[in-house]
């Protein structure tokens, strides 16, 4: 059995786990190192770090602070990987945590996040789905039972300083074209809720001030939400920093490409 490099404790805040982070920045320290060709297991939180609960109220979806997301396990360094290389990642298997066999779907409130269909569905809604093997069903959507295709919505490598600067400049300019749009066109760095993994002191503060938010996909991978990136997939990532810095999270049991189901 491969070694589990990163574990999560669902009874504690994700901020207490120094092997996860919720921003992209070249100075986030590697939490583990592996050799090329190594097999390993990593556990992840859901994208909210456990904020959404298994209950019948959508208040948590309505009230979530969206600046905390996404909580990613990593970064993991690969020995010998250097800028300019391609990091090849084989997803050998993907599955839910045995102690948490459920997931959720929902609509954000128009007052907090919005979505593609926010004018049609302005109020927060949530459904809980119980996972039984390959299938799922929901007490909130009676009569539906279907097989999922489990995949990480978010997987990628750390940017270098130049790429990070490009992202922040590009997204700042995009926001300025329509700063009041709901949902927003992009999300700028936001230090108060940044989790910089094992970074300390001035480095932690720098990551908070400059770290790119994890919402969009970018040149390094990121929040691609490609449903076919499941078990058996082979993914090629450009390496920007020594070691690459692979991170992943935002696991989905079932979702269409692009994540428009969470509208």
Show the residue positions of the predicted features.
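Short, structured beta-strand/loop micro-motifs enriched in basic residues and often containing a Trp
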Residues: 15-25, 65-73, 212-220
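Short, conserved secondary-structure segments in the cores of folded domains
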Residues: 20, 30, 74-77, 225
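Loop/turn positions that initiate beta-strands
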Residues: 37, 81-84, 232
């Amino acid at each position: 059995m491969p070694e589990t490099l990163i574990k999560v404790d669902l009874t504690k805040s994700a901020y207490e786990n120094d092997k996860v982070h919720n921003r992209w920045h070249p100075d986030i320290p590697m939490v583990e190192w592996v050799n090329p060709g190594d097999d390993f297991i990593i556990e992840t939180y859901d994208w909210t770090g456990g904020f959404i609960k298994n209950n019948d109220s959508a208040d948590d979806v309505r009230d979530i602070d969206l600046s905390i997301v996404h909580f990613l396990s990593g970064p993991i360094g690969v020995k010998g990987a250097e800028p300019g290389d391609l990091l090849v990642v084989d997803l050998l298997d993907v599955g839910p945590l045995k102690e948490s066999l459920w997931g959720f779907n929902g609509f954000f409130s128009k007052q907090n996040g919005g979505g593609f269909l926010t004018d049609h569905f302005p109020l927060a809604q949530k459904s809980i789905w119980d996972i039984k093997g390959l299938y799922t069903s929901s007490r909130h959507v009676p009569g539906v039972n279907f097989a999922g295709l489990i995949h990480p919505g978010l997987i990628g490598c750390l940017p270098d300083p130049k790429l990070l600067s490009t992202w922040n400049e590009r997204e700042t300019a995009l926001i300025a074209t329509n700063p009041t749009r709901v949902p927003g066109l992009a999300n700028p760095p936001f230090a108060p809720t940044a989790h910089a993994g094992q970074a300390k002191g001035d480095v932690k503060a720098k990551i908070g001030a400059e770290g790119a938010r994890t919402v969009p996909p970018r040149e390094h991978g990121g929040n691609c939400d490609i449903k076919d990136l499941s078990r058996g997939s082979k993914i090629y990532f450009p390496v920007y920093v020594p070691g690459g810095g692979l991170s992943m999270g935002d696991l989905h049991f079932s979702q269409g490409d692009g994540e428009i189901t969470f509208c």
